[in-house]
């Protein structure tokens, strides 16, 4: 990919790079700070030859003069493998559970393509959570998301753990399925 030296400005988690050519929206960018520290970002806006880049790991230690910016030429991708089941990942898809990296050649764009609702199969697989308020009032269907919003100090983490542990297909099927749990602001207990 194309590499640039220096930044035009740094403002919180955003940096501006001028003189950019052949960049695209949502392109992943790699920063090298002081010749060694690596950080990752994503282009969130393009205007003429300027790119606004969101830095995922913060802009600490980044300088206007000594930061190298490399355009990767691809959007954010996540590695996929059966070994992902039971693992813990950070927000950019890197394992944080101490079990090492995923070994796979399969990567997918996290942005995906929009689904045509007319061509989508009608959802039929009920998910039993074992929590009567959810099962009776806000029934979950396979493939659906269940947001859990909670105030500080409430047992939202215990509720989420209970759902993940008890979830099963409601029709009594032994067909395997996975629960994908994503969270912000919870402890890794």
Language model features with spans:
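N-terminal accessory targeting/assembly segments
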Residues: 1-87, 91-92, 96
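Small-side-chain structural scaffolding
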Residues: 15, 23, 41, 51, ...
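P-loop NTPase nucleotide-binding/switch module
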Residues: 67-70, 76, 83, 93-145, ...
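The Walker A (P-loop) glycine that initiates the GxxxxGKT/S ATP-binding motif of P-loop NTPases
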Residues: 150-151
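Conserved P-loop
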Residues: 154-189
């Amino acid at each position: 990919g194309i590499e640039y030296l220096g930044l035009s400005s740094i403002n919180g988690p955003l940096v501006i790079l001028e003189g950019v050519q052949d960049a695209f929206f949502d392109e992943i960018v790699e920063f090298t700070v002081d010749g060694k520290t690596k950080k990752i970002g994503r282009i969130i806006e393009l205007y003429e030859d300027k790119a606004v880049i969101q830095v995922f790991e913060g802009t600490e230690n980044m300088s206007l003069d000594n930061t190298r910016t490399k355009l990767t030429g691809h959007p954010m991708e996540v590695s996929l493998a059966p070994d992902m089941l039971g693992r813990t990942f950070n927000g950019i898809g890197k394992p944080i559970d101490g079990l090492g990296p995923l070994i796979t050649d399969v990567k997918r764009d996290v942005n995906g393509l929009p689904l045509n609702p007319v061509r989508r199969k009608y959802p039929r697989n009920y998910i039993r959570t074992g929590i009567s308020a959810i099962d009776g009032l806000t029934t979950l269907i396979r493939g659906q998301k269940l947001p859990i919003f909670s105030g500080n100090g409430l047992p939202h983490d215990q509720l989420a753990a209970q759902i993940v542990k008890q979830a099963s297909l409601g029709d009594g099927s032994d067909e395997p399925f996975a629960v994908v749990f994503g969270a912000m602001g919870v402890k890794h207990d």
